[in-house]
UniProtKB/Swiss-Prot annotation:
The keyword DNA damage does not apply. This is Protein fem-1 homolog CG6966. Keywords: ANK repeat, Repeat, TPR repeat, Ubl conjugation pathway. InterPro entries: Ankyrin_rpt, Ankyrin_rpt-contain_sf, TPR-like_helical_dom_sf. GO terms for molecular function: ubiquitin-like ligase-substrate adaptor activity. The lineage of its organism: Eukaryota, Metazoa, Ecdysozoa, Arthropoda, Hexapoda. Residues 433-460 are annotated as: Disordered. Residues 450-460 have a biased composition (Low complexity). Coiled coil: none annotated.
Length: 664
């Protein structure tokens, strides 16, 4: 019987009697081992602190001498928290009695989780005011920030906890401190919408600083649609005329897209135009018309604005144009709302407009953002899902009488080119990063390493360079970004390959598809479990959009196309599996094994578990599916004989054959 599960479950479920009975008559060594053992990443003490079981915690600390600083993994609001100390768990969950007990037992009030979150920050997050006061009184440092540079004051402001913010400010918490990405408590407050806390911060000397995205708190409030905060901030003497105008224009765009309040948007834009017309007039910066926006130009007069009232679609395009002018093409919200509008078009059955807008956003992302940006990855995944839907649902009647149109192969090919390009960019970027890690350059000057928090009236002048820095910080810490991008590219390639043997592709387009697959295959990028594109094509769990049958793996057409452009049928993954192994580890798809074998796959290759194609087929006899003699070479027979009889071959055969022999 494994007692650690009994002990853990008793602690988790507040079953003190069970816990005592299980540990009764156990030696101190056994008790120590059981109460420090982890189940699902957590110890009995950690889970009992998380769940608020006072008596269990007291028993573990006093009778069992549990280490008050042991850490574990717990979940809050569905998010896993790694390396959380007991005090952090109790503070986050709001269990004041347990917090006091732990502190009395010597718990470090400034202990941190893996992300450098302190118990005090955890209490600030969910508004546990009494715990905040208790921890500060016992030495908790309210200026310790998490790994993102986010302080206790910032999170209290973001979550709208007025009393905690007021208390921290009374202790002289740094009101203008910046996070890693340059935002301050005033930014967090503007984004969350608490006017009361905003006024409190301003009273304590908060300034209108600019973050790494080029955003002031005023623009942050406009983007999130908090009109009371915008109205308050534009009355401040430190806010320039241009900043007031930009805030009203951007807030109007938010009311169009986020709140769907056209009347309020028109009123805000009218106020902005009237402000521009005041002497001396402040004209808008002329923007080149964008085809994806249907060549819409920004209105420059109240008369033009009134004419737009009867055309909601033009108002929606106007919102996109305004947002791109003010925030710049690099801001996440610029791309987000382009894609948001495209999704609405798709819901209305206007798939051509959706593809046009999404393509524009993707082009913009690849032109400006760093390779493997999360936004670019998201765009590619969205295209894969959209194309899957359109291929499967073509001809289906939608609401409002529209029909899902057949997909245009050239649209899909254009996006596939962009996906392959992103993998190429990502691979070059990853290799460059690896080189930099091996040969680190000299440190950047301090001014380049930390955000500059200086007051500014507008985001437009600095947004491009600062946002690129922010995205570099994001991508540098995501080792799986290249793999995810490759998977999206494989998925779109799979959709295209399903059209290769149909009349949907002209000979020239087929040549282009195969050329793009060749470019993708020659990169030799590996995905999860060190698998190639061909591995992925042969394995059921590769499916991204499982709702649509044409997108499901294994894909015979994709495997065939990849073999045609030179994919290695004998490449092995981290478990020694070839594509042929994976093709057999599922409900068997007979044509796939024939295609792989015809493409040069070795019939008798063993994976690291000693499994072959034949053993994985069992109990089905192999000869009922294929002709083994047809796919067994003399070289394979020789290699198998060498391995079977454990014949020493080093120095006897060429070194180039060693790997081949070991595969058998």
């Amino acid at each position: 019987m494994d007692y650690k599960f009994i002990v853990f479950n008793a602690a988790r479920d507040n079953n003190l009697a069970q816990l005592k009975a299980t540990l009764y008559n156990k030696s101190s060594v056994e008790v120590g081992s059981l109460i420090s053992a982890k189940v699902n990443g957590a110890t009995p003490l950690v889970i009992s602190c998380r769940n608020g079981h006072y008596d269990i915690v007291e028993y573990l600390l006093t009778k069992c001498r549990a280490n008050v600083e042991q850490v574990g993994s717990v979940s809050f609001d569905g998010e896993p928290i790694e390396d959380a100390p007991p005090l952090w768990c109790a503070a986050a969950a709001g269990h004041l009695g347990i917090v006091k007990m732990l502190v009395r037992r010597g718990a470090n009030v400034n202990s941190t989780t893996r992300t450098n979150s302190t118990p005090l920050r955890a209490a600030c997050f969910d508004g546990h005011y009494e715990i905040v006061k208790y921890l500060v009184h016992h030495g908790a440092d309210f200026e310790v920030a998490n790994r993102h540079g986010h302080t206790c004051l910032m999170i209290a402001c973001y979550k709208g906890h007025f009393r905690i913010a007021q208390y921290l400010l009374s202790l002289n918490a740094d009101v203008n401190r910046c996070s890693v990405k340059g935002n301050t408590a005033l930014h967090d407050c503007a984004e969350s919408g608490s006017l009361q806390i905003l006024q409190l911060l301003l009273k304590h000397g908060a300034t209108m600083d600019v973050d790494y995205y080029g955003m002031t708190p005023l623009l942050a409030a406009s983007v999130t649609g908090h009109m009371p905060i915008v109205e308050h901030l534009i009355t401040l003497p430190c806010v320039s005329r241009e900043s007031r105008i930009h805030a009203l224009e951007l807030l109007g765009a938010t009311y169009v897209d986020r709140k769907r309040d056209m009347a309020a948007a028109l009123n805000l834009w009218r106020r902005a135009l009237e402000e521009r017309a005041v002497e001396p007039p402040l004209e808008k910066k002329v923007q080149e018309p964008v085809p994806a926006y249907e060549m819409v130009r920004e209105v420059t007069s109240v008369e033009e604005l009134e004419e737009m009232v009867l055309d909601p679609d033009e108002m929606r395009m106007q919102a996109l144009v305004i947002r791109q002018r003010i925030l710049g093409p690099t801001h996440p919200d610029t791309s987000y709302y382009i894609r948001f509008r495209g999704a609405h078009y798709a819901d209305a059955g206007r798939f051509d407009r959706c593809i046009e807008l999404w393509s524009y956003a993707l082009t913009m992302q690849q032109k400006i953002l760093q390779p493997l940006s999360p936004m670019t990855q998201s765009s590619l995944l969205s295209f894969a899902e959209l194309f899957s839907f359109m291929l499967v649902e073509a001809g289906r009647l939608l609401p409002r009488g529209r029909v899902v149109p057949p997909i245009e192969p050239d649209s899909m090919l254009t996006i596939f080119y962009k996906a392959v390009k992103e993998v190429e960019r990502g691979l070059a970027f990853t290799l460059e990063q690896q080189k930099d890690q091996q040969h680190p350059q000299k440190q950047l000057p301090a001014a380049d390493k930390s955000p500059s928090c200086s007051a500014s009236s507008s985001a437009s002048s600095s947004s491009s360079t600062t946002l690129l820095s922010a995205h570099q910080h994001d991508c540098n810490h995501d080792p799986n970004a290249l793999s995810r991008t490759m998977i999206s590219a494989i998925h779109i390639g799979c959709l295209l390959s399903s059209l290769l043997d149909t009349d949907a592709l002209s000979p020239e387009m087929r040549r282009q598809v195969m050329g793009a697959l060749y470019r993708l295959n020659r990169l030799k990028v590996r995905v999860r479990f060190d698998r190639t594109a061909l591995h992925y094509a042969c394995y059921r769990e590769g499916t991204l959009a499982g709702r649509y049958p044409s997108c499901q793996f294994p894909s015979v057409t994709l495997a065939k196309a990849l073999l045609e452009v030179g994919a290695d049928p004998n490449a092995i993954d981290e478990a020694g599996n070839t594509p042929l192994h994976l093709a057999t580890m599922q409900p068997y798809v007979e044509p796939l094994s024939h295609i792989l074998l015809e493409g040069g796959a070795h019939l008798d290759t063993k994976n690291y578990a000693g499994e072959t194609f034949e053993s994985l087929l069992a109990p089905t006899p192999m000869h009922k599916i294929i002709d083994p003699m047809k796919y067994t070479t003399l070289a394979c027979l020789a290699a198998r004989t060498i391995k079977k009889h454990d014949i020493r071959y080093e120095g006897t055969v060429p070194a180039t054959l060693y790997e081949f022999i070991e595969l058998h």
